[in-house]
Each structure stands twice: as structure tokens, then as C-alpha cells.
Amino acid sequence: IGCNWSFAPIVDINRNWRNPIISTRTWSQDVEQTLELSLEYMRGIMESGIAPAAKHFPGDGIDERDQHLSFAPNWLSCEDWDATFGRVYGGLFEAGLPSIMAGHIALPEYVKYFNPEATTEELYMPATLSKYILTDLLRGEMKFNGLVVTDASHMVAMTSAMKRSEMLPTAIAAGCDLFLFFNDPEEDFN
């Protein structure tokens, strides 16, 4: 389609050294350093004609489970999230970040903020399937108007939430623009 796109930078914040995925892939455990290095990476690849997709919104590095194999939420309060992951993503949005990759990470405190009557299922729905996280928080509160792609759709944190036939339309309704990986093209497109 005439563009190069990188699923990077990883802007997760390493707040749990036992996290098997993020502890070796993040810039730092420091918010400001994560933002500074992510901004420089973003500027550099954009100058080279590559579109960045910061990941994994709303932020990994808190829990010690791996979304490839299990469900793993981000347990931060709204205030703590705003001061950490919200600060990093907000800074990238201000600098013109064109896309993000939504992670299969629940953000229950923000779901409660948007819907105090949320069910347990809604509280722990992965961001890729949550209207509260992608539409209300990302697009509404944070005013992000770029492209949203899901993380890999075969990861257990997503597949354990619902049947695949429900998952695709739910991801689109939640606010995802692109779905990463298909199972059976005929099944998925129907």
C-alpha cells in the first residue's frame, strides 16, 4: 500500500522485573526516560519514511503474566496510570504519533471510571475488545485520532475473552481499525 510500518516503539514501563515479556524489551522503569527515548525513536523512523505504532496500549509491565499464555491486567489506579502510561502515550500523541497497537491488557480502574456499574466481564475485558478503553479513554479523553491495530489475535488473553466469531466485530466496535492475523480467512471475513 505504499508505506512502511513498524510495530514499535515498545513504550511499556518495566515496573515488575518478573514480567516475562516486558522486563527485557522496555526502555526503562522511568516514565520520563521512556517518553524521551520513545520520542526520539519515533522521530527517527518517521524521518526515514516509516510509520511507528507504539505498543502495548494501555500499558504492560505491571503484572507478571504473559498475554500470549494468560490473562494479565494493568492494576494501576486512574491517577497512577495517568502519571505513567498516560504521560508516555500523551506525550507521543502531542508529537504526532500516527498509530498504536492495542494490547490484550485490561485496565479495570478506568473501566470503573467510565462505568461505575460495569460487570466483572467488562472490568477485565482486554483493551482490544473494550469500548471503555479504546473509545472512551483513548479516542475520547486522550483525543487520539490515529490508527489502532490489535496485538496478535491468537494470544490467549484475547481468545479466552470470547468466541472468535464474536471477537472480530467486538474489536471493531471497541475502536480497532486493523486486526492482526486471521485464523481462517473465509471464517473471519464472513
Model segments located where?
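Second-shell residues forming the walls of enzyme active-site clefts
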Residues: 29-190
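Divalent metal-dependent hydrolysis catalytic cores, especially in the metallo-beta-lactamase
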Residues: 2-9, 175-179
